[in-house]
Amino acid sequence: MNSLLMITACLVLIGTVWAKDGYLVEKTGCKKTCYKLGENDFCNRECKWKHIGGSYGYCYGFGCYCEGLPDSTQTWPLPNKTCGKK
């Protein structure tokens, strides 16, 4: 039983370490904007959407910042795409 608990704890820890953090990005290449800095329901909801897959989100530097994102989620800055330019 103790071994099972240790294995489970290690898997949870590994998942946390391998998760990435970053700003949500719009199709334009800009950060997803927010205005209420700190704890922010909008950013938290956006980060936790199924297609985003984050564990927590808040407003930092007027952009939605997400923690615990899978590697497949794009974060700002996008390579070869400048905010607002084509």
Curated annotation (Swiss-Prot):
Q: Where is this protein primarily located?
A: secreted
BP GO terms, sorted? defense response
Q: Which GO terms describe its cellular component?
A: extracellular region
Secretion signal span: 1-19
**Pfam families the UniProt entry points to:** Toxin_3
Q: What does the UniProt entry say about where the protein is found? A: Secreted
Q: Which residues are modified to Cysteine amide?
A: C83
Tissues expressing this chain: Expressed by the venom gland.
Question: Disulfide pairs?
Answer: C30-C83, C34-C59, C43-C64, C47-C66
Which residue intervals define the domain LCN-type CS-alpha/beta in the entry?
Answer: 20-84
Which GO-annotated molecular functions does the record name? sodium channel inhibitor activity; toxin activity
Give the keywords, sorted.
Answer: Amidation, Disulfide bond, Ion channel impairing toxin, Neurotoxin, Secreted, Signal, Toxin, Voltage-gated sodium channel impairing toxin
Known role = Beta toxins bind voltage-independently at site-4 of sodium channels (Nav) and shift the voltage of activation toward more negative potentials thereby affecting sodium channel activation and promoting spontaneous and repetitive firing. Affects channels from chicken and frog.
The similarity annotation says: Belongs to the long (4 C-C) scorpion toxin superfamily. Sodium channel inhibitor family. Beta subfamily.
Q: Domain notes, please?
A: Has the structural arrangement of an alpha-helix connected to antiparallel beta-sheets by disulfide bonds (CS-alpha/beta).
Q: What is this protein called?
A: Beta-toxin CsEI
Which source organism does the UniProt entry give?
Answer: Centruroides sculpturatus (Arizona bark scorpion)
